């Protein structure tokens, strides 16, 4: 399995597939926001940024999958997936244990050199409450689904990282 993951990480197909999944999840978030009119909260926006980090990592890996740039893509992938798990878990705890003393921020806090909420308010502006339960599918809230999604991204990323230390088998037609 590790040799298979090593081979996949050296080709563009797996990186582009990951980019497609992250992009479709972003489109789903925008559908919930603009079509279903669910108001994203601050934690939702941060989770969206973590997903954009995974999308960026996959595009970085697809640019040059056989070069050392692949290692930077794996590092960004792991970091973004880990932050996504942390954010989604904290968001889940806010929803499962609502308290007036335990709330999320009222406004997103992006760095002054990267004010995403000012540049793209349709994507990064927060207007909802983190503890409000707005959507449910198969008895799980949206942050609970995101815990599973980010955890899957993280497990696969760690396996791909481990596979980088496994030498791929040479595929020789005559078995030499």
UniProtKB/Swiss-Prot annotation:
GO cellular component: plasma membrane
Alphabetical list of InterPro entries matching this protein: DiS_bond_form_DsbB/BdbC, Disulphide_bond_form_DsbB, DsbB, DsbB-like_sf
Compartment list: Cell inner membrane
Gene Ontology MF terms: electron transfer activity; protein-disulfide reductase activity
Disulfide bonds: 41-44, 104-130
Single GO BP term: protein folding
Transmembrane spans: 15-31, 50-65, 72-89, 145-163
Periplasmic membrane side: 32-49, 90-144
Topological domains, Cytoplasmic: 1-14, 66-71, 164-176
Membrane topology note: Multi-pass membrane protein
Keywords from the UniProt entry: Cell inner membrane, Cell membrane, Chaperone, Disulfide bond, Electron transport, Membrane, Oxidoreductase, Redox-active center, Transmembrane, Transmembrane helix, Transport
Origin superkingdom: Bacteria
Family of the protein in this entry: Belongs to the DsbB family.
PANTHER family: DISULFIDE BOND FORMATION PROTEIN B
General function of this protein: Required for disulfide bond formation in some periplasmic proteins. Acts by oxidizing the DsbA protein.
The protein's name: Disulfide bond formation protein B
Originating organism: Yersinia pestis
Source taxonomy: Bacteria, Pseudomonadati, Pseudomonadota, Gammaproteobacteria, Enterobacterales
Chain's gene name: dsbB
């Amino acid at each position: 399995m590790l040799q298979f993951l090593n081979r996949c990480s050296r080709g563009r197909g797996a990186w582009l597939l990951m980019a497609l999944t992250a992009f479709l999840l972003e489109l789903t978030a925008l559908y919930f926001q603009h079509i279903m009119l669910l108001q994203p909260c601050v934690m939702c926006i941060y989770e969206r940024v973590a997903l954009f980090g995974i999308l960026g990592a996959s595009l970085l890996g697809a640019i040059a999958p056989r070069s050392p740039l692949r290692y930077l893509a794996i590092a960004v992938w792991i970091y973004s997936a880990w932050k996504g798990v942390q954010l989604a878990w904290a968001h889940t705890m806010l929803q499962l244990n609502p308290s007036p003393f335990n709330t999320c921020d009222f406004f997103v806090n992006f760095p002054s050199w990267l004010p995403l909420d000012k540049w793209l308010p349709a994507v990064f502006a927060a207007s909802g409450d983190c503890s409000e339960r707005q959507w449910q599918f198969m008895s799980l809230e949206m942050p609970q689904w995101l815990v599973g999604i980010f955890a899957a991204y993280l497990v696969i990323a760690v396996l791909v990282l481990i596979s980088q230390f496994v030498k791929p088998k040479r595929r020789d037609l005559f078995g030499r």
